[in-house]
Design a protein with these regions (language model features):
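Short beta-alpha connecting loops at secondary-structure transitions
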Residues: 177-182, 202-207, 252-260, 285-286
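Conserved thiamine diphosphate
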Residues: 133-137, 189-221, 263-290
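Cofactor-binding active-site loop characterized by glycine-rich and histidine/acidic residues
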Residues: 29, 33-165, 183-189, 194, ...
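A short, conserved beta-to-alpha structural element at the edge of catalytic cores
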Residues: 165-185
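Cofactor-/ligand-binding subdomain signature composed of acidic, glycine-rich
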Residues: 1-36, 57, 277, 303
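Glycine/aspartate-rich loop-and-adjacent alpha/beta segment that forms the canonical ThDP
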Residues: 2-3, 225-323
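Acidic, glycine-rich active-site loops and adjacent beta-strand->loop/helix elements
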Residues: 65-71, 145-151, 173-179, 210-213, ...
Length: 323
């Protein structure tokens, strides 16, 4: 673990990060038992929870599609509501008008990805940061996206605007090394996203995405810098997509021995082992936390499965438009 755990506040924060990752994984594991087309983020929880747990309630968060449910949980969403949304039940965030794992919670300062189009959330984040700059609030904004989306032109338009106008935004690449079946080693010219971002004159750094404490520290420092009016930061959080692009993806296009090596770097197991070795948790504590997360997910899934399906009333004007 890159950051020593040596005080009560840090211990509490790191336990919170561990619980956040465990809850996210438990919900995703439950979902994959009923959905063959879910886009799992197993092994990427360090980037997701490290980023979204660094946000204050006033900050703005925009998640990548992979892990959007984990990000929503990190921001206080009800797991039953998120699962209901994936199942298309009336108790979901869209009341059944849309089903899928792209739908996050509806909440102030949090914007889920409500379609499969990748990249627009980067522009939304830049716009949110511009708004906070113009109104003088200077709240921080953080957006996550994959290395495939990092080749989108909108990212570079956004980096340029954020740098030119010194906007309070943190760009976090959830760099899992695959865009469906295309490895990033064959898709990123020059091999470095950090060099690309640094060319815009902003701080740009690479962190170990499987070290949730390192991610949380980097994002927290970048957000503090943003709130001080010192502008944007780019963070390339290197991780690995140990699951398929979707649940039923056999991953025949890649070397499974590499996947096995990355599985050994699991962010949950790394933090749990660190807390145990530091004497801040026992293995029984870790097991109890995991069991609690799995019980919560199981209950949420059972409840959501029993929830009603939508009827035609969900497209009535009062349910489709804000007052």
């Amino acid at each position: 673990m890159s950051v020593a755990i040596n005080n009560r506040a840090a211990n509490s924060a790191h336990r919170d990060l561990l619980l956040s990752m465990m809850r996210g994984r438990a919900v995703e594991d439950a979902i994959q038992k009923v959905s063959g087309h879910y886009h799992p983020a197993r092994g990427e929880e360090g980037v997701i929870c490290g980023t979204f747990r660094a946000l204050s309630d006033a900050d703005v968060g925009l998640p990548h599609y992979r892990g959007s449910i984990i990000a929503s949980l990190s921001r206080g969403a009800d797991p039953r509501e998120l699962i209901a949304g994936l199942l298309g039940k009336v108790t979901g965030p869209t009341r059944g008008r849309q089903r899928g794992d792209f739908v996050g919670k509806f909440a102030p300062n949090y914007f889920g990805l409500f379609s499969g189009t990748l990249g627009p959330s980067i522009g939304y984040a830049t716009g949110a940061a511009l708004a906070s700059k113009l109104d003088g609030s200077n709240v921080g904004t953080a957006v996550t996206f994959g290395d495939g989306t990092a080749n989108s032109g909108l990212l570079y338009e956004s980096l340029n605007m954020a740098a030119m106008y010194v906007l309070p935004v943190v760009f976090v690449c959830q760099h899992n090394q695959f865009a469906v079946s295309m490895p990033s080693s064959r898709a990123i010219a020059g091999g470095s996203l950090v060099q690309r971002a640094a060319a815009f004159g902003m701080p740009a750094l690479e962190v170990d995405g499987n070290d949730v404490v390192a991610v949380h520290t980097a994002v927290s420092e970048a957000l503090a810098r943003a709130r001080r009016g010192e502008g944007p930061t780019f963070i390339d959080a290197l991780t690995y997509r140990v699951s398929g692009h979707w649940t039923s993806d056999a991953c025949t296009y890649r070397d499974q021995s590499v996947t096995e090596e990355w599985t050994k770097r699991d962010p949950i197991e790394r933090l749990a082992a660190s807390l145990v070795s530091e004497g801040l948790m026992t293995q029984d504590d870790v097991d109890a936390m995991r069991a609690s997360a799995e019980s919560e997910a199981s209950t949420a899934m059972a409840t959501a499965q029993d929830d009603p399906w939508p009827d035609a009333s969900v497209i009535d004007a009062p349910n489709a438009f804000a007052e």
